[in-house]
Amino acid sequence: YEPNAIWSGEFQSAIWTSDPAWILYDLLINDRYGVGVPESTLDKYDFFAISKYCNEMVPDGKGGKERRFSCNILINSRDEVYNVIQQMTAIFRGIAYYGVGTLQLLQDKPTDPQYLLGPSNVVDGIFEYQGTSQKARHTVACVAWQSYDTLGDIEYEYVEDADAIAKYGIIKKDIKAIGCYSQGQAHRIGLWTLKSEQALTETCNFSVAIESG
């Protein structure tokens, strides 16, 4: 299929890919080395939308361009299905959960708001906010990735948020980038983690009635 075209839903002949969305899809439907989930229970258009975001070209940090998310991984041991799914979705900044009879996928990417909540459609109009701890607001990330230049040996990408360091000091977070053979992708993983933790510093609890949607 062509990621930048309107997709009819038909697949071409099976080929090798480093696209984490379709690697996950293959692991889910394959009954030999995967889960063996019926294709009819999966929304392949969700995978297609995630794949398009994964394949957008972004700066690689060396003057060139590369795909936003790529996955080069060898799975040679057994593990719980849930663990494998969560590890794979983490590659493209996603989560998976089971709902309405099928596996649902969500990805952290720019999108339109899905629902507007306010005091009028929240029980008693009450929102309860709680801030994250300072220890949870990391200022330095050390991302472990693998390099083709060293035949798959582990390399470490150091990423820091200078403004956050000036405010909180050094608070380090170690990250293992699964299936990552790109220094640029490793850097983006670290940067996204730091910026998210500095920007998303509150959780909000509230209750809604069934009629609120």
How would you label these PLM feature ranges?
Residues 6, 13-213:
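C-terminal extracytoplasmic interaction modules
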